[in-house]
Amino acid sequence: MEGLSLLQLPRDKFRKSSFFVWVIILFQKAFSMPLGVVTNSTLEVTEIDQLVCKDHLASTDQLKSVGLNLEGSGVSTDIPSATKRWGFRSGVPPQVVSYEAGEWAENCYNLEIKKPDGSECLPPPPDGVRGFPRCRYVHKAQGTGPCPGDYAFHKDGAFFLYDRLASTVIYRGVNFAEGVIAFLILAKPKETFLQSPPIREAANYTENTSSYYATSYLEYEIENFGAQHSTTLFKINNNTFVLLDRPHTPQFLFQLNDTIQLHQQLSNTTGKLIWTLDANINADIGEWAFWENKKISPNNYVEKSCLSKLYRSTRQKTMMRHRRELQREESPTGPPGSIRTWFQRIPLGWFHCTYQKGKQHCRLRIRQKVEE
């Protein structure tokens, strides 16, 4: 009881304190002054509503876009698994959105695919689209396929990340990583936060040896690209290949290349020599150099937010990232028509809000239709 008495106020001071509390509450209602500041990562949906949806986000200058690689979701990054996540579709225009900062990717891809008649499957990159700048391994694949559609999209609705530009489609001959775009909400706009590199910066940042970040290239040939059943060959040289039929790490392919070269198992003719992997060979050597999400909250957010029209909330979970080795997993596949369209819900129209006669008025800077 003595401890509780410390929390009690004398009657006269209680009246004065309650008066000031009511003054603060009324002042906040009148001037929309936020009483709290978001300082941690344990946000509830209602807190996001209070900060973003009730007059506290005055301008999109407070939003900073960041590209997050799908490697953070623990997806298989080998070429046979990755290509199953991509599919062709017609009648859907490509969309591009810029982002200001990103992660260093462990695995990037570069595709040069032709149709049986010799025409190109993938469109050339538009002006200003450059390859993803930070790649530890670049998987360069050439080949042929039916390519049944105008563009190659991501079946799970993710973006293809280029140099500070994210597109919904794959461009020919340009390094890209798989990822999504997230928005950071800043308490106040800061000019120096996440500044973009200079426009004149070199396109291939990995050429700078002082960065201690070397890019290694792995080459492949793909047959029947874009179809349900395709064949992927790892290229040792122009006439020697290895058939890839299971998930594997980049380190395994480098060791495989060294083994074939060391034991002189290369093709000694002008014909194509294709090796197959023994069933007992472990293709998981080395480290699966990406993250795996461990779910610490079994339930999804069930409370609806005013942001639900912009982002899907059905798959959001509280997650914690930590490093570990991943076991082999089956890559989810789906029919070409199962492309999810939540990536088209990202707001591409910038807005700015002002106060007039005590009320907030918002207007779009650039009007752009967002498809549902």
Swiss-Prot record:
Q: What is this protein called?
A: Pre-small/secreted glycoprotein
Q: Which domain of life is it from?
A: Viruses
Keyword flag Glycoprotein: yes
Report the InterPro entries cross-referenced here: GPC_FiloV, GPC_filovir-type_extra_dom
Which residues, renumbered to this chain, are glycosylated?
N40, N204, N208, N238, N257, N268
Q: Which GO terms describe its biological process?
A: monoatomic ion transmembrane transport
Q: Which gene encodes it?
A: GP
Which cysteines link up through disulfide bonds? Answer: C108-C135, C121-C147
Give the protein family.
Belongs to the filoviruses glycoprotein family.
- Extract the signal peptide range: 1-32
Does the record carry Aminoacyl-tRNA synthetase as a key word?
Answer: no
Region Disordered, as annotated, extends over: 320-340
**Any one GO cellular component localisation term in the record:** host cell membrane
What is the species of this protein? Sudan ebolavirus (strain Boniface-76) (SEBOV)
Task: Name the UniProt key words of this record, in alphabetical order.
Answer: Cleavage on pair of basic residues, Disulfide bond, Glycoprotein, Ion channel, Ion transport, Secreted, Signal, Transport, Viral ion channel
- Site positions (Cleavage): R324, E325
GO MF entry, a single one: channel activity
